Amino acid sequence: MNATTINSLFLIGALLVGASILVSSLSSRLGIPILVIILAVGMTAGVDGGGIIFDNYPTAYLVGNLALAVILLDGGLRTRVASFRVALWPALSLATVGVLITTGLTGMAAAWLFDLNLIQGLLIGAIVGSTDAAAVFSLLGGKGLNERVTASLEIESGSNDPMAVFLTVTLIDMLASGHTGLHWSLLTDLIREFGIGAVIGLGGGWLMLQLVNRIHLATGLYPILVVAGGLVVFALTNALHGSGFLAVYLCGLVIGNRPVRSRHGILHMLDGMAWLAQIGMFLVLGLLVTPHDLLPIALPALGLALWMILFARPLSVLVGLAPFKAFHGREKAFISWVGLRGAVPIILAVFPLMAGLPNAQLYFNLAFFIVLISLLVQGTSLPWVAKWLKVTVPPEPAPISRAALEVHVTSEWELFVYRLGAEKWCIGAALRELKMPEGTRIAALFRGQQLLHPSGSTVLEADDLLCVIGHEHNLPALGKLFSQAPERGLDLRFFGDFVLEGDAQLGAVSALYGLKLDGQDADMPLGAFIAQKVGGAPVVGDQVEWNNTIWTVAVMDGNKIGKVGVRFPEGSRPGPGLFL
């Protein structure tokens, strides 16, 4: 490879990445997922478009694995362990039982549609059997979904790859060797993959956390160290025949949920690296496909994609979530619809090509077609379906910007900046009149371009910029004080006519509003009663019916319900009483 060739590669690569970023700005206008646009850029530049011929499957496999490792590390860093209280076991059920059911149903349909034997059909099912972390993390961000749905989908996508990889490799071995029998040793192999991945992931995350917090480096080196450590965990786990995808996700989870030096710098850089990984991966996968090869299989492939979306995935979700009573029917329906396929199926489809199996090109083209349909149909309709199924909650007010204050190694202090909207009640109030959350301080006040020195007598005006020092857990209380809040009508439509304190006694509420206790303990707090009715760990937006009245979880205080919205039947709305 001479200098001219290398220069041409740099030029073409930079132009493709730049074009992907620029064209992605059309995503929100067209309502098309960014990942589809990036895939389209790669396909347009490929053999049937710009004429770039790329058929190096090992390179695509390398790029895909590297990109997925970075994306999963970033996803783990941003996942809160608190979300595990509502979604860990349901997500693991979807990641194991759900993948098995999807693989079986999709495989049988594929065998019938494409005149393959059962093992070949099941291989197709295994290749497309898992949801994709890159697609899920990318498309769920900022959609305002309730915590149970979001956490279930994110944890599932971060943990279901081991099952899909295991099934794919096992079925490839069967086809290559001609042995089609199943042995109990396969189950032990699967448990080993999960076990090695979990142990190395958790252990590697803890070691990286200690290393980052104990050594002194230039600020910009900490994110690189975390990425390098994540890749070591990924590669070492794979070398020991464990699940590298699970390991790197858990590694990020450990680091992201403990005090860590340069936390915001790490997250900021990982965000950019994860985007670059997604762009590079989907560009390469777009270049790898030959669009005209998809046309002969388009109709049966479309039928298989619709079978998986409309039957296999919903049935796997119904079975996988059957033991978990907290999930409402509309939540199960939404989780069924968001069985997003992305890069993982295409990367798994490279395995048969590298193994030299018959029909390997068919497997690859099918996987690509199904991913394209999944992103176009499910990804594009996701916001509409979320609103239709009522799994969204009113957005929490947030600061316009936030920055870390590195006052010591594991400092969790942050600086939050709020712009005061004209409708906020605090406009015209003196600072001494504000009920600030404990442990927070107002650091500065900007009016126009002027920096003011705030004092207790300073009166707030519309469009003031207020800088507040606090912790992440102070954000809900600060948001109510200073942020541009959603319209009150939105809260009333969602939470009900009034909002009641969660520690109000059930007997007092029943007596004041003429409700029947039906044998319930009168001294039980309303929040505990609603949690009992939910049947699992409650989240904001959970609704139950009691005494012909709709009760909605409005605020969570840790693991307890802090406030409950209540909607009375039409024409029977009482006065506010205990309601706040």
From Swiss-Prot:
Keyword annotations from UniProtKB, A to Z: Antiport, Cell inner membrane, Cell membrane, Ion transport, Membrane, Potassium, Potassium transport, Transmembrane, Transmembrane helix, Transport
Reactions that this protein is recorded to catalyse: K(+)(in) + H(+)(out) = K(+)(out) + H(+)(in)
SUPFAM superfamilies named among the record's database cross-references: FAD-binding/transporter-associated domain-like, TrkA C-terminal domain-like
Protein localization: Cell inner membrane
Domain RCK C-terminal, chain residue ranges per copy: 402-484
Superkingdom in the source lineage: Bacteria
MF terms (GO), sorted A to Z: flavin adenine dinucleotide binding; potassium:proton antiporter activity
Chief localization: membrane
Membrane topology note: Multi-pass membrane protein
CC per GO annotation: plasma membrane
SMART domains the UniProt entry points to: CorC_HlyC
Pfam family, one: CorC_HlyC
Transmembrane portions of the chain: 6-26, 34-54, 57-77, 94-114, 121-141, 162-182, 193-213, 217-237, 240-260, 269-289, 292-312, 334-354, 366-386
GO biological process, one term: cell volume homeostasis
Gene3D superfamilies to which the protein is assigned, alphabetical: 1.20.1530.20, 3.30.465.10, Regulator of K+ conductance, C-terminal domain
Function text: K(+)/H(+) antiporter that extrudes potassium in exchange for external protons and maintains the internal concentration of potassium under toxic levels.
Similarity comment: family membership: Belongs to the monovalent cation:proton antiporter 1 (CPA1) transporter (TC 2.A.36) family. NhaP2 subfamily.
Stated name of the protein: K(+)/H(+) antiporter NhaP2
Lineage, top ranks: Bacteria, Pseudomonadati, Pseudomonadota, Gammaproteobacteria, Pseudomonadales
